[in-house]
């Protein structure tokens, strides 16, 4: 399926309710035109206040997503967001806390959230440029 910003907003709200107890404020959402990154979460911290600002969730529109794979990528980025929001991991790493939370969600809800994903198995979205897709097979 090809994705839209509205679709990501809807899925964010659904996954926040299902997996994060509605604790995460809605971030800004953008579509990435990248075959190298499936998703990315970024934010900045307000020094001295322990607040997270400028939350940005980006999901690649380069791929023709299957429902489960898209869910796992969005939840992966939401784990980064949750850990930053709760000041558990302020560096947005795939460290011990990330892996522990991913394992808990995977076992409790039957997800497949991983640190890395093999995008060579994904189909290119019909609207995605072809050159980058073929370059992804070379590099």
Per-range role (PLM):
Residues 72-84:
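Active-site recognition of the HExxH zinc-binding catalytic motif
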Residues 1-69, 85-139:
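Metalloprotease/metallohydrolase-associated module, dominated by Zn2+-dependent proteases
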